[in-house]
């Protein structure tokens, strides 16, 4: 519990004030530039699981704008498309690192909704709750899949989804209602992967996704 409070307190998701000056603001932060994902919004490469093995590139350097983004687990779980999906009108960016077969693949997405935070924050939380529910239902929508939610903090969720003998997926999703943003970090490999899974705790990974948002979306975490 102390670890949870300490890590998520840094980014204020447990209503603990975030210290001013955690990182220096960049000229491209939001505001004023809110029609794209700021470079400062992305998780630092060394904080991505298995960095010591793969030496991941800076996500901001490989990210591209994307439209109507969907989570990595949705195809595996055969999640049916909804009639109205808030992700269709989000400002979004995606960073993908493709590896040879048997290695861990990487996808990171940042979705942001512009507007008054009381409204966009609720949108972000609605999207996260929908994703969490879809993961829980995965074994029903895709009977060959086996989902396990390893951490559910309300504002962040981590899960392992596997298809026996075929694929394993590690999914992290983090919502920050103070700036109307949701971040996904997904890593997957054919089973068994060449490199055994190794990562910091779920809470630490989720915190690493959350902290940059306080810099990218100016004054959102005060």
Regions found by a protein language model. Give the residues of each.
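Stable alpha-helical elements in mature extracytoplasmic
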Residues: 120-127, 131, 202-205
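N-terminal "mature-domain start" segment
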Residues: 24-95, 222
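Secretory targeting and sorting signals
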Residues: 1-25
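A short acidic-to-branched-hydrophobic micro-motif
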Residues: 89-122
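Processing junctions and N-termini across compartments
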Residues: 24, 28, 70-71, 132, ...
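Short Gly/Thr-rich strand-loop-strand
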Residues: 57, 62, 68, 72, ...
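A short, solvent-exposed beta-edge/loop patch
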Residues: 142-222
């Amino acid at each position: 519990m102390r670890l949870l409070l300490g890590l998520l307190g840094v980014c204020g998701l447990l209503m603990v004030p975030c210290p001013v000056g955690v990182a220096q603001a960049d000229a491209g932060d939001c505001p004023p530039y809110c029609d794209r994902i700021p470079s400062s919004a992305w998780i630092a490469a060394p904080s991505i699981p298995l960095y010591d093995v793969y030496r991941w590139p800076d996500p901001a350097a490989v990210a591209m704008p994307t439209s109507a983004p969907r989570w990595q687990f949705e195809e595996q779980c055969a999640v049916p498309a909804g009639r109205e999906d808030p992700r269709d009108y989000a400002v979004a960016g995606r960073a993908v690192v493709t590896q040879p077969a048997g290695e861990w693949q990487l996808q990171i997405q940042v979705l942001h909704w512009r507007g008054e935070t009381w409204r966009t924050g609720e949108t972000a939380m609605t999207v996260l709750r929908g994703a969490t529910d879809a993961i829980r239902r995965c074994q029903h929508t895709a009977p060959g899949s086996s989902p396990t939610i390893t951490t559910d903090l309300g504002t962040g969720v981590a899960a392992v989804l596997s298809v026996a003998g075929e694929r394993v997926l590690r999914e992290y999703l983090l919502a920050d209602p103070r700036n109307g943003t949701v971040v996904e970090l997904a890593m997957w490999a054919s089973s068994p992967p060449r490199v055994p899974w190794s990562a910091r705790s779920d809470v630490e990974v989720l915190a690493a996704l959350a902290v940059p948002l306080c810099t990218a979306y100016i004054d959102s975490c005060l």
